[in-house]
């Protein structure tokens, strides 16, 4: 098996919760990350937005707090998701979520 693990901290910009037809609870977030990192001895501004998916009952205790403006750290794996219009994007599937505020 190859490694697929990402840890990313940021601010929630959108959040919605729904249950799948199978009855599984899902929360979908848009996470905005801003930081500065050194690359080739130069300081670089880093910015990204990524969709985060939390699935299952294990996140029920934290989902009430996952609203726009809340800072979190997410650990999980990346997966390719294709939208209805055929656009591909990377999605972070959460395995652990930690509130930062």
Swiss-Prot record:
One of its GO terms (cellular component) is primosome complex. GO terms for biological process: DNA replication, synthesis of primer. Residues 1-101 form the SSB domain. InterPro entries: NA-bd_OB-fold (IPR012340), Primosome_PriB/ssb (IPR000424), Prisomal_replication_PriB (IPR023646). One of its GO terms (molecular function) is single-stranded DNA binding. Keywords: DNA replication, DNA-binding, Primosome. The keyword Lipid biosynthesis does not apply. Pfam families: SSB_1. The keyword DNA-binding applies. Homodimer. Interacts with PriA and DnaT. Component of the replication restart primosome. Primosome assembly occurs via a 'hand-off' mechanism. PriA binds to replication forks, subsequently PriB then DnaT bind; DnaT then displaces ssDNA to generate the helicase loading substrate. Belongs to the PriB family. Involved in the restart of stalled replication forks, which reloads the replicative helicase on sites other than the origin of replication; the PriA-PriB pathway is the major replication restart pathway. During primosome assembly it facilitates complex formation between PriA and DnaT on DNA; stabilizes PriA on DNA. Stimulates the DNA unwinding activity of PriA helicase. This is Replication restart protein PriB.
């Amino acid at each position: 098996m190859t490694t697929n693990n990402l840890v990313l901290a940021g601010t929630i910009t959108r959040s919605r919760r729904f249950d799948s037809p199978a009855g599984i609870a899902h929360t979908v977030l848009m996470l905005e990350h801003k930081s500065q990192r050194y690359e080739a001895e130069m300081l670089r501004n880093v910015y990204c937005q990524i969709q985060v998916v939390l699935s299952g009952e294990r996140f029920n205790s934290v989902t009430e707090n996952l609203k726009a403006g809340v800072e979190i750290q997410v650990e999980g794996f990346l997966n390719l998701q294709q939208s209805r219009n055929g656009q591909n994007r990377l999605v972070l599937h959460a395995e652990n979520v930690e509130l930062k505020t």
